[in-house]
């Protein structure tokens, strides 16, 4: 498989394989443009389809973790006819090489306890690749890591994510432009909440 790196120089002419609709693509690309200077890397296959990896120095990740010195994987996704050919291994190896070249402590990524959940990494695959659980939130989200040295301090969740809670009744949904699927799901979650009389506040995070 051949891969291409999306950069500030080619992002206008290249498609983002996780964002195929107009609004999804525009907002995702704008978010990426602002992150390239912070060290974000986006590799995708040259073939059409969802086969890509996106990662960034953990200090600049838009997730509530403490993982200085690590590289955080925003998304590793291979789907459809591209599954089962070892492409996820190739993309992950590219990330490992980049992280080691930068002198990083290791990699980290979010998954869920016990099973694969939508929009989170597969814990069984990550464990097979050498990742271990560094921390777990009360809502069952795991922070997994792959240290490059045995004495590397494990990353951890910040307190707000370790013990998530809101003061008001109902639910608060926080989302960013990092994942383009929020433009599909957030309105549908809001609609479902209205239909069932569930208090819901959606918060669009636009800065770290």
Give residue spans per PLM region.
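A conserved beta-turn-beta hairpin within the catalytic core of GNAT-like acetyltransferases
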Residues: 60-73, 83
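C-terminal "cap" of GNAT-fold acetyltransferases
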Residues: 138-163
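Local sequence-structure signature of Cys/Sec-based thiol-disulfide redox active-site neighborhoods
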Residues: 160-195
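Conserved acetyl-CoA-binding loop-helix of GNAT-fold acetyltransferases
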Residues: 78, 84-99
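Short amphipathic alpha-helix that is part of the acyltransferase structural core
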Residues: 1-48, 181, 185-189
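Conserved catalytic-core motifs of GNAT/GCN5-like acyltransferases
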Residues: 110, 127-144
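Conserved GNAT acetyl-CoA-binding A-motif
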Residues: 99-115
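Conserved beta-strand in the GNAT
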Residues: 44, 48-60, 72, 77
